[in-house]
């Protein structure tokens, strides 16, 4: 009898387990639905529910709730607006086997048994679908989504990740991790941005802050998956005609990037132990003595007396206010680091924070968590999710601002030493939740406080903050850098690590980190033989010149200033840096576009050429804006570079006259003093004179290089300008100067459009200079129908920064250029160059 009872119990237990197991591995059947304005909720026979909310005609929020409660612990840290446009009242068309919802751009089909979601475009092309009967699975707190994987589908995104840009065949985790000297295949890294895009013209943003995972065909060639170990399974499907449109809608959800001060787009110098007044003066004088442009000098963490009292270290800084004023007079801004902790050695501040309850708690004992830290001893971790902390921290960080610093770099915000293997950190309890939920957004909450307190206490001043650890939405508060990139055991052999930074930077841009940099020279490794590293250093600087926030940085007291690597390396580094400064009007115009759309300055090739599958694997080159193609040399000893040119005609930017047809791979010469670059035919590139620093001259002549389009076509560019340091760009205080060049069978018609923007004006007069690259020289030039005086190049350039009454032109057949000088009066002018 006991045997029968036992066997019967085992039988029912096995059956129950089988039913339970089945429930976890199959999505239930849809039995009913309810609708409310934008949302439709579908109820399944396993007690789960799935809600679709139309954010716009092309964006759908999908919420899988295993218990049907649709409750979340915290509002979204990333999404600031999900009602993107009026979609009216959602109408559900019920049929025998499915439900359908239509928008002007999408057809959404929900099959009933089992629940299976499919999304089509308006032309009935299937874009996205649940995989078979396991689209939505739960197992305890763990939730998984399985989606159909097409044979020709490719994936891009997930923010700052190593490896190839095409994510297909790879798996990734989101867990902000301190990975010093990380390799070319390291994951996870410092930032978590669970947003990716498919070549089927959709994007997915998983709005979950836990340690989520993404597997793009690593488990099966038939499906890909994403999962979360806790929290809610909420994600947004975003449809667009191309990647740019998808990214713009993601920005609409998560907020526009702030614009950096213009000076931040120049060059910056740093090193790990750049933490003294004496060294700061030496570096500043070294740059100015040699005429190498530089705008920013960083001070690393050792600038403080203690973490994080924001007091200048005694003995290192005799008179920091005077130092900052002197450096400002030399054209330098100073940026200092901050860590998100209070050292226990900093007794007064630690006791204050502990007494006020401003430190993250240890859930096992209720006391402030005792956090080991890479320097400064054990620390308390500041709880930036607690609202009262903001003003307290803001008052401390204001002290060096009042002394004269220009900004911060927020370092170690993972927080450091809390990588996924360090599970003992999970006992940390923040005001808004346990550490498994808050870890990935910890840096984001800190960045938010730093930015908002900066603006609160420094009205109308543009914040500069560069961060290492963050989450989706960071673009609202901060800028980025790619952390402590490695060089390997031998710093002179760090070629692979340098090459790796190109896809890492491009990947960051796809995660809406348009303003970023790597540690130029690589963070790790002692440099014992500077001549032996001269070639690698040169190539680092050449690649780094196209980082939006170019910063030279290295660990410890390893000096990495350009003049230390030999005369040739210094000369080549200076040339690369000067190129960036000449391009600043172009760069700043694209900085405005980044603010408006989220599009990065450094762009993967497929962002501009989404239909060209060859661009999916071009990880060693990139577009810089829409007009310039850059292919840095990243191999030791290489004096040429294999480059892919997409559709169109491409002109070698290093000689301005050699043209190549697109849609081909080609090998181009790349001696040590050359960065392989191409400009697309039909482009206008605005430039400024090289300066020691970006605002050395408040007003200057702008030169427009024009590479005319083919006959019958026109070339356009709209130059963007503003004050560069204030928040006027948010209030419409900026101006645009539209330039158009039309190619005809008689010559070229250049139109300088009326300057737009009444709220901002130039601080002085200037000349506009034009350089048209052409093989056929015009014989006559007319300004608004009147003949223009012809002159020589010397006269054309004479007094161009002080004399604003001369209009003249100069055809130069030898150089293949047609030059024009025109005083900038802000009015429309038509210039005809006639053969």
Language-model-detected regions and their locations in the chain:
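Short, small-residue-biased leader/transition segments that mark boundaries at the very start
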Residues: 1-5, 450
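Bacterial Sec-dependent N-terminal signal peptides
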Residues: 6-27
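N-terminal processing/targeting junctions
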Residues: 16-19, 587, 778
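Catalytic-domain carbohydrate-binding cleft regions of carbohydrate-active enzymes
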Residues: 125-674, 679-680
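Solvent-exposed, conformationally flexible loop/turn segments
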Residues: 637, 662-663, 822-831
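Aromatic sugar-binding surface patches on proteins
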Residues: 812-816
């Amino acid at each position: 009898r006991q045997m029968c009872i036992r066997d019967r119990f085992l039988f029912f237990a096995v059956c129950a387990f089988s039913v339970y197991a089945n429930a976890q591995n199959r999505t239930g059947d849809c039995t009913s639905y309810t609708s409310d304005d934008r949302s439709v909720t579908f109820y399944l026979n396993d007690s789960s529910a799935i809600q679709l909310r139309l954010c716009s005609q092309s964006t759908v929020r999908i919420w899988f709730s295993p218990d049907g409660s649709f409750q979340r612990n915290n509002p979204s840290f990333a999404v600031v607006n999900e009602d993107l446009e009026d979609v009216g009242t959602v109408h559900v068309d019920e049929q025998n086997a499915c439900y359908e919802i239509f928008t002007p751009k999408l057809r959404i089909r929900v099959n009933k048994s089992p629940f299976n979601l499919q999304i089509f475009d308006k032309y009935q092309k299937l874009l996205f679908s649940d995989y078979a009967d396991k689209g939505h699975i739960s197992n305890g707190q763990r939730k998984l989504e399985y989606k159909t994987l097409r044979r020709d589908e490719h994936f891009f995104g997930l923010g700052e990740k190593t490896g190839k840009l095409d994510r297909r065949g790879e798996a990734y985790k989101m867990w902000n991790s301190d990975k010093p000297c990380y390799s070319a295949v390291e994951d996870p890294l410092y930032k978590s941005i669970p947003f990716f895009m498919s070549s089927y013209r959709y994007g997915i943003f998983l709005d979950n802050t836990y340690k989520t995972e993404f597997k793009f065909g690593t488990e099966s060639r038939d499906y890909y998956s994403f999962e979360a170990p806790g929290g809610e399974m909420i994600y947004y499907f975003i449809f667009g005609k191309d990647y740019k449109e998808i990214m713009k809608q993601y920005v609409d959800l998560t907020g526009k990037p702030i614009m950096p001060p213009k000076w931040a787009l120049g060059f910056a110098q740093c090193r790990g132990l750049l933490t003294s007044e004496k060294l700061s003066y030496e570096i500043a004088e070294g740059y100015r003595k040699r005429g190498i442009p530089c705008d920013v000098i960083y001070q690393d963490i050792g600038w403080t007396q203690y973490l994080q009292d924001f007091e200048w270290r005694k003995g290192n800084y005799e008179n920091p206010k005077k130092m900052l004023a002197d450096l400002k007079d030399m054209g330098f801004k100073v940026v200092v680091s901050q860590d998100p902790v209070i050292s226990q050695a900093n007794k007064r501040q630690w006791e204050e924070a502990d007494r006020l309850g401003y430190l993250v708690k240890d859930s096992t004992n209720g006391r402030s968590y005792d956090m080991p830290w890479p320097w400064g001893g054990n620390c308390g971790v500041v709880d930036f999710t607690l609202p009262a902390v903001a003003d307290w921290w803001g008052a401390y960080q204001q002290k060096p601002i009042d002394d004269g610093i220009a900004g911060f770099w927020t370092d170690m915000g993972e927080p450091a030493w809390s990588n996924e293997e360090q599970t003992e950190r999970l006992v940390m309890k923040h005001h808004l939740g346990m550490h498994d939920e808050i870890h990935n957004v910890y840096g984001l909450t800190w960045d938010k406080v730093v930015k908002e307190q900066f603006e609160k206490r420094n009205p109308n001043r543009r914040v500069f903050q560069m961060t290492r650890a963050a989450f989706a939405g960071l673009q609202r508060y901060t800028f980025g850098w790619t952390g402590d990139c490695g060089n390997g055991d031998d710093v002179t052999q760090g070629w692979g690590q340098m090459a790796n930074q190109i896809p890492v930077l491009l990947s960051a841009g796809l995660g809406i980190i348009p303003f970023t940099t790597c540690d130029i020279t690589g963070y790790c490794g002692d440099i014992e033989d500077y001549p032996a590293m001269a070639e690698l250093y040169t190539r680092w600087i050449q690649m780094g010149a196209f980082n939006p926030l170019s910063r030279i940085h290295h660990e410890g007291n390893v000096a990495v200033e350009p003049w230390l690597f030999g005369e040739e390396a210094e000369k080549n580094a200076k040339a690369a840096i000067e190129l960036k400064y000449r391009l600043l009007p172009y760069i700043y115009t694209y900085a405005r576009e980044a603010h408006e759309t989220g599009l990065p300055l450094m762009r993967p090739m497929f962002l501009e050429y989404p239909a060209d599958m060859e661009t999916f694997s071009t990880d060693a080159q990139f577009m810089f804006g829409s007009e310039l193609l850059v292919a840095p040399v990243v191999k030791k000893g290489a004096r040429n570079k294999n480059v892919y040119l997409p559709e169109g005609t491409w002109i070698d930017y290093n000689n301005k006259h050699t043209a190549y047809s697109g849609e081909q791979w080609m090998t181009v010469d790349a001696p040590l003093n050359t960065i392989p670059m191409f400009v697309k035919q039909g482009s206008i590139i605005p430039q400024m004179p090289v300066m020691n620093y970006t605002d050395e001259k408040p007003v200057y002549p702008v030169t427009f290089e024009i590479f005319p389009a083919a006959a019958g076509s026109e070339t356009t560019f709209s130059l963007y300008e503003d004050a560069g340091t204030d928040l006027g760009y948010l209030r419409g205080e900026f101006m645009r100067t539209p330039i158009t060049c039309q190619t005809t069978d008689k010559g070229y018609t250049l139109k300088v459009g009326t300057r737009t923007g009444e709220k901002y004006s130039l601080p002085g007069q200037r000349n506009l200079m034009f350089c048209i690259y052409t093989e056929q020289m015009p014989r006559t030039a007319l300004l608004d129908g009147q003949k223009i005086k012809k002159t020589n190049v010397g006269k054309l350039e004479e007094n161009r920064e002080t004399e604003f009454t001369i209009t003249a032109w100069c055809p130069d057949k030898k150089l293949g250029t047609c030059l024009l000088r025109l005083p900038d009066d802000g009015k429309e002018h038509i210039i005809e160059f006639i053969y």
